């Protein structure tokens, strides 16, 4: 469950290390984002010579949350950290690699490129 002012790790090689959610997209009164949702983020920490720099405002897809997700079969999945992948306006990832596992729920939200780049899909 991601809301405004939430800090997230970046799970790709775009050059950003930490981002902060500044808006949850999808309706004027929407408060929380979950896995697969698009948010607007501000880059808080970045590596030198990366594709993005500190202070940039980008869109990102939430790929891991510490809040557990219920699946239709009754199982629950949760991660240790909140993480996101930076995307462009065409919903394509900015980085060329994804770090760490991503959940199957991204497939239902049509983020197939992120699933194909991920080393492990849970």
Curated annotation (Swiss-Prot):
Keywords: Ribonucleoprotein, Ribosomal protein, RNA-binding, rRNA-binding. One of its GO terms (molecular function) is large ribosomal subunit rRNA binding. Pfam families: Ribosomal_L14 (PF00238). GO terms for cellular component: cytosolic large ribosomal subunit. SMART domains: Ribosomal_L14 (SM01374). The keyword Ribonucleoprotein applies. The keyword Ribosomal protein applies. Transmembrane segments: none annotated. GO terms for biological process: translation. Part of the 50S ribosomal subunit. Forms a cluster with proteins L3 and L19. In the 70S ribosome, L14 and L19 interact and together make contacts with the 16S rRNA in bridges B5 and B8. Belongs to the universal ribosomal protein uL14 family. Binds to 23S rRNA. Forms part of two intersubunit bridges in the 70S ribosome. NCBIfam families: rplN_bact. This is Large ribosomal subunit protein uL14. The lineage of its organism: Bacteria, Pseudomonadati, Pseudomonadota, Alphaproteobacteria, Hyphomicrobiales. The gene is rplN.
């Amino acid at each position: 469950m991601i809301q405004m002012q939430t800090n997230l790790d970046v799970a790709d090689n775009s050059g950003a290390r930490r981002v902060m959610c500044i808006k949850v997209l999808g309706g004027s009164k929407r408060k929380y984002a979950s896995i697969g949702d698009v948010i607007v983020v501000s880059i808080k920490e970045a590596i030198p010579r990366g594709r993005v720099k500190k202070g940039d405002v980008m869109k990102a897809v939430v790929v891991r949350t510490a809040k557990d997700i219920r699946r239709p079969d009754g199982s629950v999945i949760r991660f240790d950290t909140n993480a996101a992948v930076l995307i462009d306006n065409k919903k394509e990832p900015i980085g060329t690699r994804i770090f760490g596992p991503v959940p199957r729920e991204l497939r239902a939200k049509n983020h197939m490129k992120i699933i194909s780049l991920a080393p492990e899909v849970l």
